[in-house]
UniProtKB/Swiss-Prot annotation:
NCBIfam families: rplX_A_E
Native species: Staphylothermus marinus (strain ATCC 43588 / DSM 3639 / JCM 9404 / F1)
Chain's gene name: rpl24
PROSITE patterns named among the record's database cross-references: RIBOSOMAL_L24
GO CC terms in record: large ribosomal subunit
Protein name according to UniProt: Large ribosomal subunit protein uL24
Length: 152
């Protein structure tokens, strides 16, 4: 996903920091677990409140929990059970970057999210069908399988 057309790091960072919130949501993509990937046919989806995630990197690696809150401004999410204590012993959630988690259970209570999954699944299936069709025609020297069988 190109944030800007410039290759300069300073302009890349500037575009990231000044990105509007409705576009910043795209930065929350996280991979799905193997089971979910096979079930829905999608590799990545944006993390939402209510999803269950597994932390894959950092001090909290291996922890699983429900996403409690998402901070679009800081591009961080907060997971249930991942907390630190402040000096006065009050617990606060530890911020985690969405690229460091894997979604293990989706919250499909939103009909729009189901539509997104269906749309992405359809794109993937159509790409697979196109690849199969091109491989069939390339094997027979530009002829389809039916044409080559008719010549025999």
């Amino acid at each position: 996903m190109a944030i800007t057309y410039s290759s300069k790091p300073s302009k890349q960072r500037k575009a990231l920091f000044n990105m509007p919130l409705h576009l910043r949501h795209k930065l929350f993509n996280a991979p799905l677990s193997k089971e979910l990937r096979e079930k829905y046919g999608v590799k990545k989806l944006p993390v939402r409140k209510g999803d269950v995630v597994r932390i894959m990197r950092g001090d909290w690696k291996g922890h699983e929990g429900k996403v409690v809150r998402i901070d679009l401004r800081r591009v961080r999410l907060y997971v249930e059970g991942v907390q630190r204590k402040k000096a006065d012993q009050t617990p606060v959630y530890y911020p985690i970057h969405p690229s460091k988690v894997m979604i293990i259970k989706l919250d499909l209570s939103d009909k729009w999210r189901r539509k997104i999954i269906e749309r992405r699944k359809g794109l993937i299936e159509s790409e697979v069908v196109e690849e199969k069709e091109t491989s069939k025609t390339s094997e027979g020297g530009g002829k389809t399988i039916e044409e080559t069988e008719g010549e025999k």
